[in-house]
Each structure stands twice: as structure tokens, then as C-alpha cells.
Amino acid sequence: MNIVILAAGMGKRMRSALPKVLHPLTGKPLLAHVIETARTMSPTRLVVVVGHGGDRVREMVGAPDIAFATQDKQLGTGHAVMQAVDQLDESVPTLVLYGDVPLTRAETLSALVGAAGNDHLGVLTVHLGDPTGYGRIVRDAAGRITRIVEQKDANETQLAIHEVNTGILVCPTAKLKSWLATLSNDNAQGEYYLTDVIERAASEGVPITSAHPLAEWETLGVNSKVQLAELERIHQRNLAQQLLEDGVTLIDPARIDVRGKLTCGRDVVIDVNCIFEGDVTLADGVRIGAHTVIRDAAIEAGAEILPFCHIERAKVGADSRIGPYARLRPGTELAEDVHIGNFVEVKNSQIAAHSKANHLAYVGDATVGSRVNIGAGTITCNYDGANKFRTVIEDDAFIGSDTQLVAPVRVGKGATLGAGTTLTKDAPEGKLTVSRARQVTIDSWQRPVKQKKEG
């Protein structure tokens, strides 16, 4: 089967410099959703028709299995498909999809393709309570589809029809090519309508069949930011419903955003206003606090993420406790039972089991052993303005509050750094290292007094 995806539209109502099909829905471009669904059908040829912003669309797709055709002038859907016909295999049918209709399920498309077979024309239709703006499906007395009439070309009788065209169709490729060659733009829009091939098929006696989606939202398209926002909420609601059915506890299913792939184990609890981006895995018993953002990360069994945390490209070990207000940056790997507390930032660091940094610390480019205590105000000084250097803190070390570790530097096993230390040389294991000025009390010192302003 050939699949042609129409993605050439300018999207004027989006009021954006970004091509319409590149606007994100649940974290990825509209067109990417359509391509993902198309690939599940294993097409022999997959062609994307581009036009406005074509170079940016090609760059986004960036896949060797996808061919492109260009529609330089926006002269309608029929004209768009004409640009792709030379790349199609005539021995198999062609399915036409739309880059701004992202949520049509593969099962629905398979049903349409199955109903059409190799020699019928198949149309995906839907019944709408308010069909305004859609092409109407016109049937004869026997219920056979005879034509599709666009809104601007419809008479009063046709406008009263509630069965509408979704634009998605499948038909024999050789027939499609011949019908496209006969299309006219003599209509209110001055465009070449793909839907006119229905009338051509009927006149030639080609059987026309139809299929229907299970849900109306499968056929909804995007022509404005309003419609994009509506579709985002619909898709998020569907994703939340699936999570609930899979056994995840959502404190409020209406207040979760999944912008990628979220995989959850058993007894996972997710509080309100959490955002999951990219590929995120939450193992058994994980609890995610409110207002947390997690991107491309794995949270292992029994870990708890307290509210207002930000975790990106990091791994959190089993039974660890993160937050509130903690940030784990790319390259962070935490072993089991690690505590990262409020206003602690960890970047590109490995922290072994049972270690803690409970308050106000920066741990960057560091290797931290087991059972290490990192006091409040500790900073690994990893950057000299040009290069990054690593800090190594071995097992059972104790880092006092307000300590600066100027990398490259090593803290030995069981070593203690006194509060306020600025460490520039390795600290030996099992010993106390302190570097700060001796405390002095000046008896005769007087605090300056502000002078009162006259007048």
C-alpha cells in the first residue's frame, strides 16, 4: 500500500511562522503523529507532500524511508496528491492522510483499507452534530455514496446532511491517477478537490464503501491555536484514561501532561500538575509530587519525588527521596536510598547508596561514594571558565556546611571536612581537614552608625 500525507498547507489561522504541521501536540509535531501511525501499516511507499516551510518539514522528518513531493502553489487537496502520483506503486492501493489530523487510530485506518480491498474506493466518514465547514456525504436512495459536496458549494438540502467527509480515503492507484487528471477547479474555492474523485468513481461504476471511526476526535484537524489546544486536551484526557486503566493513581486525571512515552509499574501515584516529557519510566511504587517535571528519566521502585522537582536525563535509584524543589540535570545517576533535598542541584554526577545532600547544595561533575553526608551550602567548584573538572568523594565522608571543593580534588574514605572549608588539595582518608581563618574577637570594635539626614 502507498500512503500519501498532505502537509503543504500554510496554516494562516495559526498566526505563526512555524509551518502548521510542525506545531506540537503532546510534545511532538502534528505531522510526526501521522507518520508514526502510517508506519504501523507497513506501507511500500510513504510520501509526504510539502509546500509552505517545506525545508523545515523535511528537516523534522529526516527519515530515509520517506519520500517527498512539493506543492509550490496551494491549489487544493487534489492538486497536492497530483504532485505525489509519479512516486506511487500502481500495483497497490493508495491511502491519503493529512498532516494536520494527528489522532486517527491505526485500527480505524486498517478497517477502511480492509473495507475497500484492492478495487473499491473507501472513504472515512463521521456523523457530526454540527457539520459546519465539512464536505457533506451525498448518498443515493440505496444508501450508496455518490459524491461529496464542500460546504461552500452545498445547497440547503445538502447542508442539512450530518454525515461528513474526513478527507481520508483509499482507492486503486491507477484509477486515482486517471481521476486526478480530470479534476477541475471550477468551484467556489477555485481549487482542485480530491473529494471530486468520488463522483468520478461513481460515474465509472467503481464500488464506493465507507468506514467510521470509533470516536469523533479521531478525525479532528487543526487550523488554529484554539483547535490545537482543544485537541491537546482531548489527547491528554485519552492518555490519562489509559494510565488509570493500567492501574496508575492520578490524583486529578485532568491535571497531568504526558508529552512523550510514560511507562508505569504497579501502584504508581502521580499528584497534580506533573509534566512528563520524552521517555519516562516510573517503576513499582513510585510517588510523584505535585508540580514536578520529568524528562527522559528513569525512577526506580519505591522512590519518592516530592513537589516542585525538575528531573532531566537522570536515573533515580530505588527507595530514594528527592525534593522538594530539587533539580537533577543530565548525567545524574543516583543509587538506592539516596536523599536529595530542597534546593539541591545535581549535574553529571554519580551518587552511591545511602548518601545524602539534604539542603542548598550544588553537586556537579562528581563521583560520590556510599553513606556520604553533604552539608548545606556545599558547592563542587567544577568550572574554571574554560574546562570542567571532577570531584571524587569516597565512602563515609562527611562534608561540613558551607564547603567549597575546588576540582579536581578528592576526599578520602571516612574523611571529614570542617564547615566553611575551601578544599583545594586532596583530603586524606579518616582525618579532619579544615581550611579557614582563625576566629578573632576585637574588643574595641564599634559598629558604624548611620548619620541622620538633616531636613
From Swiss-Prot:
Name of the top EC class for this enzyme: transferase
GO biological process: one example: cell morphogenesis
Region (N-acetyltransferase): 247-455
Positions bound to Mg(2+): 100, 223
Alphabetical list of NCBIfam families matching this protein: glmU (TIGR01173)
Role description: Catalyzes the last two sequential reactions in the de novo biosynthetic pathway for UDP-N-acetylglucosamine (UDP-GlcNAc). The C-terminal domain catalyzes the transfer of acetyl group from acetyl coenzyme A to glucosamine-1-phosphate (GlcN-1-P) to produce N-acetylglucosamine-1-phosphate (GlcNAc-1-P), which is converted into UDP-GlcNAc by the transfer of uridine 5-monophosphate (from uridine 5-triphosphate), a reaction catalyzed by the N-terminal domain.
Protein name: Bifunctional protein GlmU
Native species: Ralstonia pickettii (strain 12J)
